[in-house]
Amino acid sequence: MTSDINALKYKKVLLKVSGEALMGDKQFGHEYDVIKKIAGDIKEVIDLGVEVTIVVGGGNIYRGINAALVGMDRASADYIGMLATVINALTLQNVMESLNIYTRVLSAIPMMSVCEPYIRRKAKRHMEKKRVVIFAGGTGNPFCTTDSAAVLRAIEMNCDILLKATQVDGVYDSDPKKNPNAKKYFTISYKDVITNNLQVMDMAAIAVAQENKLPIRIFSIKDQGNFAKVIQDKGKYTTIEE
C-alpha cells in the first residue's frame, strides 16, 4: 500500500496494545495467529509512511493490581507485571521482524542481555532510522499502568496521537458487553471521560493526555486492517480530545 504521507493527518503515532489482545480467545499467554495479524496491521500502517511506536501491556501473563487484591505486595506485583510486558514486547518484536519490520525493544527496567534500556534520545534516534520502537517495562515505576506509560511515551516521542487497540470499537457510556443499549461516542472530551468515570483508560493517563493536548483514539484490534483505516479517519473508533 502506498500513500502520500503529506495527506495524512497523523504522521507519527503511538499504538497501545493490551496484553489481552495478544492472547486472542485463550485465557492466558499468546495466540500467534492473532499476533501475526496485529503485526500485519502495523506493517500496513508503516507502508502508508506513518512512523509507529508501540507500548505493550502484560495482562495476558500477569496483572499486578489483581495480585495485590489477594494479598501480594502491590509494588512487587507491579514489578512482575512490568516483566510480563517485556515478554510480550520480545514476542511481538520477533513476529514483526518475520515480516521484515525493523524493530527495537526498549525497556524502562534495564535488561541489557535481552533488550535496550529506555533512553529518550536513543528511542528518537531509532525512529529517525525508520525502526519501530516497542516500549516495555511500563513507566518503570509501580502504581502506574501501561496506559500511563503509553501517554508518557507518546508525549516524549512527539507523537501526533495515541491509538489504543482494545476489544471494543470505541468508548461507550456503559459496558456494551453487558448493556446492548449502551451508547457509543464518536468523540468525547477528556473531562467527560473523567467525570463519568468511563473505564476506557486509566484516569491518571487521561489527565496527563489532557494537560498535554494529546488526542487518544480507541478502536478494536479484532477487525483486520482497522488500524490503517483509523489512521485515515475511517472505520469505527472514538476520539478523546478537548
From Swiss-Prot:
It comes from Rickettsia canadensis (strain McKiel). Inhibited by UTP. It is found in: Cytoplasm. Keywords: ATP-binding, Cytoplasm, Kinase, Nucleotide-binding, Pyrimidine biosynthesis, Transferase. Its EC number is 2.7.4.22. This is Uridylate kinase. Catalyzes the reversible phosphorylation of UMP to UDP. One of its GO terms (cellular component) is cytoplasm. GO terms for molecular function: ATP binding; UMP kinase activity.
